[in-house]
Amino acid sequence: DNYNDEQAEQIAAGTVAAMPHSSAEFVEKASGIKSRYVMNKDGIIDSKRMAPRLPERSNEVQSIQCEMGVAAAQEAMRQAGKTAADIDSVIVAASNMQRPYPAIAVEIQDALGIKGYGFDMNVACSSATFGIQQARDAVRAGSARSVLIVNPEICSGHLNFLDRDSHFIFGDVCTAIIVESAATATSDEQYSIVDSKLQTIFSNNIRNNFGFLNRGDESGTGAADKLFVQEGRKVFKEVCPAVAAQISGQLESLGISPDQLKRLWLHQANLSMNQLISKRVLGRDASADEAPIILDEYANTSSAGSIIAFHKHRADLSSGDLGVLCSFGAGYSIG
């Protein structure tokens, strides 16, 4: 309403389009999202600002992503029965980093007292699954006994809250995973990686042009493309079949039939996407138990979504049960 009031003359003249209203009903119908969690709500709902208020911190204080990453990491370490001395590597895998360097992973490593090495990586919404692959490779190669993967996703920071088609998509959260050899695993709950497969396909349909070279051309400052932008319908049309084909092909190569799967923990971007992908993989509609949804509560939490789904829907698994953990997103990327 504020925008339409300010642009009333241009709207009346037909030179500017009026901004349409959004609603809870529209959001739920379009995405399946009913709620979400964000780092700062007040700044977002302030119609004069519509962006989170996250004050800069001094270099002597933990960064925001480090703080949330440490909290998630400590819980993962507790559940896995691991101390800092047991871990040799930290990978921060997320869709955005709040600074280029020093790496958030190295800051988290220092905060936890972990020796070895750490690095940041970004494959957008597939960052967590790509991180798991990197961790698995490190353990198998012998360069690390145990790897901590942390996914601090502050998605509200790159979201355009003026865009009716995407303002509702993302939420903020942090997850953490520990990958190690079965020989050193001590947790009461242990999950074996049977196989993993990564794929990237270049596309401009999901994009964010914010970067350090923006200062070289002031004409783009504040433009919409410096935040999250996507061609949603194109993404749906192109990503869903690619994801289903990758999962189906991987299962076939392993000699696993779809009816052997106990669960599909899919990236939590859109309810309709997950319903279509799971139907193509299973050959029928998946039950809520087979393909659990958590985006109704958390919204799209980028790389953390499938990890949250796994975390909240794993208690009933028995030894020998099989499942697929899959993420997909900008790039395109599928893991």
What residue ranges belong to the model's regions?
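Condensing-enzyme catalytic core mediating Claisen C-C bond formation in acyl metabolism
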Residues: 1-63, 163-241, 245
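Conserved beta-ketoacyl condensing-enzyme motif
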Residues: 36-123, 253-274
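Claisen-condensing/thiolase-fold acyl-transfer catalytic domains that form or cleave C-C bonds
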Residues: 66, 70, 96-97, 110-117, ...
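Solvent-exposed alpha-helices and their adjacent loops that cap or buttress functional pockets
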Residues: 83, 112, 139-142, 167-171, ...
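Short beta-strand segments
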Residues: 93, 122, 147-153, 179, ...
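Short acidic, glycine/serine/threonine-rich loops at helix termini
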Residues: 101-104, 132-133, 158-164, 205-206, ...
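Flexible, glycine-rich active-site loops centered on histidine and acidic residues
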Residues: 143-174
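Acyl-CoA/ACP chain-elongation machinery
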Residues: 151-152, 159, 201-208, 271
